[in-house]
């Protein structure tokens, strides 16, 4: 099997989708998981104002609303978490995303002071963080806050990882990659966009240039610039289409180099790294 087909199979991507049906797949998946794990009462998700968290948030709120109605358990709750580092440049988009999702509860935690404290403590020990590593600190601090909220509310931390992100490993290990459940897994970027269009989401939330926006020396650096390929190329590749050979090599190199991110901690029984 060619590596492209191996990747497509591993990530479960379909060449075409029915947006309405895929929305229901994700909603029913979350509902079934919570019904199986009866001690879980909340879903916790960080909202950035971008496509992925907006879609995931809408899925979470729909699942929780249906669970309350179907089970009669009023304790079920979706908690949307705002996690700015200082002043967020796309604050208006975040507010629009929250308005679209209509979460049961919104919690805002500014992580800037926590990052500054961590940076200062490490510096005292002789470890001076680069801008890149500090960016990963931000991603991990955001997840730490979400897990604290989940721990106090009998919750699960929900991830936004999807196929176009997973194939490149474009997430922080034990940061935004460290979650309990990922309802977007199997969808690529354009498919996620199609779901939001189906749901009537304001288009500026899914047409904006995706950015992790973690590095202060390169603020709002577009994902596509960091990756060296466009999401259109990634989506075409994941749908089994033939793309430019150079772009395909970039995607495959990312996939192979970041395998450790998609795998539990390596043990003596693993051989994927050899």
From Swiss-Prot:
Keywords: ATP-binding, Ligase, Magnesium, Metal-binding, NAD, Nucleotide-binding. Pathway: Cofactor biosynthesis; NAD(+) biosynthesis; NAD(+) from deamido-NAD(+) (ammonia route): step 1/1. Signal peptide: none annotated. GO terms for molecular function: ATP binding; glutaminase activity; metal ion binding; NAD+ synthase (glutamine-hydrolyzing) activity; NAD+ synthase activity. The keyword Glycoprotein does not apply. It catalyses: deamido-NAD(+) + NH4(+) + ATP = AMP + diphosphate + NAD(+) + H(+). InterPro entries: NAD/GMP_synthase (IPR022310), NAD_synthase (IPR003694), NH(3)-dep_NAD(+)_synth (IPR022926), Rossmann-like_a/b/a_fold (IPR014729). One of its GO terms (biological process) is NAD biosynthetic process. Disulfide bonds: none annotated. The keyword Nucleus does not apply. Pfam families: NAD_synthase. Its EC number is 6.3.1.5. Deamido-NAD(+) binds at residues 140, 173, 180, 260-261. Mg(2+) binds at residues 52, 165. It comes from the Bacteria. GO terms for cellular component: cytoplasm. ATP binds at residues 46-53, 160, 189, 211. Catalyzes the ATP-dependent amidation of deamido-NAD to form NAD. Uses ammonia as a nitrogen source. Homodimer. HAMAP family: NadE_ammonia_dep. Belongs to the NAD synthetase family. PANTHER family: NH 3 /GLUTAMINE-DEPENDENT NAD + SYNTHETASE, NH(3)-DEPENDENT NAD(+) SYNTHETASE. This is NH(3)-dependent NAD(+) synthetase. It comes from Sodalis glossinidius (strain morsitans).
